[in-house]
From Swiss-Prot:
Subunit structure: Part of the 30S ribosomal subunit. Forms a loose heterodimer with protein S19. Forms two bridges to the 50S subunit in the 70S ribosome.
NCBIfam families linked: uS13_bact
One Gene Ontology molecular-function label: structural constituent of ribosome
Keywords for the protein's UniProt record, in alphabetical order: Ribonucleoprotein, Ribosomal protein, RNA-binding, rRNA-binding, tRNA-binding
Family listed: Belongs to the universal ribosomal protein uS13 family.
Name of the featured protein: Small ribosomal subunit protein uS13
HAMAP family: Ribosomal_uS13 (MF_01315)
Keyword Ribosomal protein appears in the UniProt entry: yes
Primary role: Located at the top of the head of the 30S subunit, it contacts several helices of the 16S rRNA. In the 70S ribosome it contacts the 23S rRNA (bridge B1a) and protein L5 of the 50S subunit (bridge B1b), connecting the 2 subunits; these bridges are implicated in subunit movement. Contacts the tRNAs in the A and P-sites.
Gene3D superfamilies according to UniProt: 1.10.8.50, 30s ribosomal protein s13, domain 2 (4.10.910.10)
Length: 122
């Protein structure tokens, strides 16, 4: 099992698919990485040489923000919005949907379990 960016990637999968197990690398970035390292798209992780794994690590470290660094960056951005007091920051602070979704009904995932109100029946 190869370890890239602090993640154990599965050995029996194709390299393009296995790289997507790293937070911050999707289909497009995985395809770009194997193109830069010049690895065939149908190659499996178990067939990679140590040199190829090292090249993949170097490309990811140099060109991409992944795993903990990416999570930290996103957290800092959200905190910045909350400190500014802008609308998006207020929505984050209140635990409500940020991108304009309705909240009269739905939005239960973001708002948490329904709170019952005593004496409210039809």
């Amino acid at each position: 099992m190869a370890r890239i960016a602090g993640v154990n990637i599965p050995t029996n999968k194709r390299v393009v698919i296995a790289l997507q197990y790293i937070h911050g690398i999707g289909q497009k970035n995985a395809a770009e990485i194997i193109e830069k390292v010049k690895i065939p798209a149908d190659r499996r992780v178990s067939q990679l040489t140590d040199q190829e794994v090292l090249q993949i690590r170097e490309v990811i470290d140099r060109d991409y923000l992944v795993e903990g660094d990416l999570r930290r960056e996103v957290g800092i951005n959200i905190k910045r919005l909350m400190d500014l007091g802008c609308y998006r920051g207020l929505r984050h602070r209140r635990g409500l949907p940020v991108r304009g979704q309705r909240t009269h009904t739905n939005a239960r995932t973001r708002k948490g379990p329904a709170k019952s109100i005593a004496g409210k029946k039809k």
